[in-house]
Amino acid sequence: MKLNLKDLEKYLFPLKRIFSKYRQIRSVEQVKTFIQEQSAQVSQMTLYGYLKTRMGAKHVLMFEDKDFLGSINIAKWHVYAASLIDCTFFCFSFLYKEKNFSKTDQANKIFFEILNTEKANGMNLDAYENATKKFNSRYSTINWSTYHNCLLYTSPSPRDS
């Protein structure tokens, strides 16, 4: 096996490859893809990381329990929806303030395009309705100039509502 410099770079600097993928976002469609992918990644890392930490070595066995898997699926959609809301607001706030992108109504359009796609992919109806309600509530009061500089999770958690 022959290693060249490119292979070595991919192995040693994977973050460069990950971040360079999004460095050249030039269209609203690319923003949509970014929001969808990042929300999925955050929710997956958050939920499965939490479960693995809490259950320890038994986490593998728990994935054989159908009731447990059903509960994980419900939780997955709720965490994803919360991530989707935060990521959408963060991205459009950043674009508004830092890139002079004034079409903040696109946030609403993109959010519901993604949410409706996920509903067609089997999103839990309760998670869908809850996300719709929370997004609309926050959308009407968001300060586009400052949101991206605030702590992301300043709103009450789902269990507080």
What are these regions (language model features)?
Residues 1-3, 91:
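N-terminal entry module detector
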Residues 4-58:
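Leu/Val/Ala/Ile-rich N-terminal alpha-helices, chiefly Sec-type signal peptides and the beginnings
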Residues 18, 33, 37, 74-81, ...:
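Alpha-solenoid helical-repeat scaffolds
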Residues 53-98:
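N-terminal interaction modules that seed assembly of large macromolecular complexes
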Residues 83-152:
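Long amphipathic alpha-helical segments
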Residues 93, 160-161:
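A very general structural signal that marks isolated residues within well-ordered alpha-helical segments
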Residues 153-160:
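Conserved small/polar residues in nucleotide/adenosyl-binding loops
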